[in-house]
């Protein structure tokens, strides 16, 4: 299979590029990206670095820009810090965490490989959407999993999911966008684990709210409100109104990312701007 060579990016002169992995509880934040009149994860990290003498650092860049309420289990990011920054790299996660609130944690830090860009070098993004499938809600999962009181047909949901995997036009499942809407969906799988269900979603890039629209549609299938075979027709229609509604953001987690050679076969055709696909 043919492959593209990875595109190379370098920090500005006088800066060292670091690669960090960060996790956060999205309930406290208006999303990843810094914005006025709201607390963001990006701004929270910058404040912690400034406390360590890193005022000259550029803004951190993440593999994906999550919306308000969305969590991250392992979000890669790069951070260009001045070469004069003196905190030893081995101590940086602990030092940052001492200044960060309990809802954000730096899990690891290293010097980024040459040419690494957290957003543009990313070849696969993984998400998990969590459901609490039980007659009664559970307080420990409030804002962390969607409560579904009725039974769900996992087998039907996975049949519908299989019909969506691959290179397709996903306009029917995403918030309306002006740019092209073809994406390569690498994984869509429902995994029940007792009352806690995980829906795994993976691809190089996603349209705005696409993951939440896919999950909302699978929920209709699981509830018997939509036939598994009907999902292919919804996909072909490109009509957002025919698919399920976006599920709430609190059940969505950015689970991880991969970096490697980007595939030519099955590419979304929009690999240059994966990080603009906010909200999932």
Swiss-Prot record:
Glycoprotein among keywords: no
Presence of the UniProt keyword tRNA processing in the record: yes
A Gene Ontology BP annotation from the UniProt entry: tRNA pseudouridine synthesis
InterPro entries: PsdUridine_synth_cat_dom_sf (IPR020103), PsdUridine_synth_TruA (IPR001406), PsdUridine_synth_TruA_a/b_dom (IPR020097), PsdUridine_synth_TruA_C (IPR020095), TruA/RsuA/RluB/E/F_N (IPR020094)
Enzyme nomenclature, EC number: 5.4.99.12
Chain residues that bind substrate: 127
Recorded GO MF terms: pseudouridine synthase activity; RNA binding; tRNA pseudouridine(38-40) synthase activity
Active site positions: 67
This protein's UniProt keywords: Isomerase, tRNA processing
Reactions listed under catalytic activity: uridine(38/39/40) in tRNA = pseudouridine(38/39/40) in tRNA
Family, as annotated: Belongs to the tRNA pseudouridine synthase TruA family.
Subunit field text: Homodimer.
Role played: Formation of pseudouridine at positions 38, 39 and 40 in the anticodon stem and loop of transfer RNAs.
Protein name: tRNA pseudouridine synthase A
Species of the source: Deinococcus radiodurans (strain ATCC 13939 / DSM 20539 / JCM 16871 / CCUG 27074 / LMG 4051 / NBRC 15346 / NCIMB 9279 / VKM B-1422 / R1)
Native organism taxonomy: Bacteria, Thermotogati, Deinococcota, Deinococci, Deinococcales
């Amino acid at each position: 299979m043919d492959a593209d060579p990875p595109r190379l990016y370098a920090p500005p002169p006088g800066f060292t590029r670091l690669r960090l992995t960060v996790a956060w509880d999205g309930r406290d934040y208006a999303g990843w990206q810094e914005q006025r009149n709201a607390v963001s994860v990006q701004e929270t990290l910058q404040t912690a670095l400034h406390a360590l003498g890193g005022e000259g650092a550029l803004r951190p860049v993440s593999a994906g820009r999550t919306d308000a309420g969305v969590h991250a289990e392992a979000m890669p990011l790069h951070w260009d810090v001045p070469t004069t920054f003196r905190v030893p790299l081995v101590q940086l996660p602990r030092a940052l965490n001492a200044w960060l609130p309990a809802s954000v944690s730096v899990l690891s830090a290293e010097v980024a490989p040459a040419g690494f860009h957290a957003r543009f070098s990313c070849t696969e993004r993984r998400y998990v959407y969590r459901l609490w499938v039980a007659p009664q809600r559970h307080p420990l999962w409030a804002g962390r999993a969607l409560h579904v009181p009725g039974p769900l047909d996992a087998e039907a949901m996975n049949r519908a999911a299989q019909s969506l995997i691959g290179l397709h036009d996903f306009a029917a499942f995403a918030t309306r966008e002006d740019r092209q809407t073809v994406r390569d969906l690498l994984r869509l799988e429902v995994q029940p684990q007792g009352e806690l269900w995980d829906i795994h979603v993976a691809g190089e890039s996603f349209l705005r709210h696409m993951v939440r629209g896919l999950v909302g549609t699978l929920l209709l299938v699981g509830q018997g409100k939509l036939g598994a075979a009907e999902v292919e027709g919804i996909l072909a229609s490109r009509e957002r109104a025919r698919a399920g509604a976006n599920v709430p953001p609190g059940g969505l987690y950015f689970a991880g990312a991969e970096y490697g050679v980007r595939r030519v076969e099955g590419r979304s055709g929009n690999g240059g701007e994966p990080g603009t696909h906010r909200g999932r």
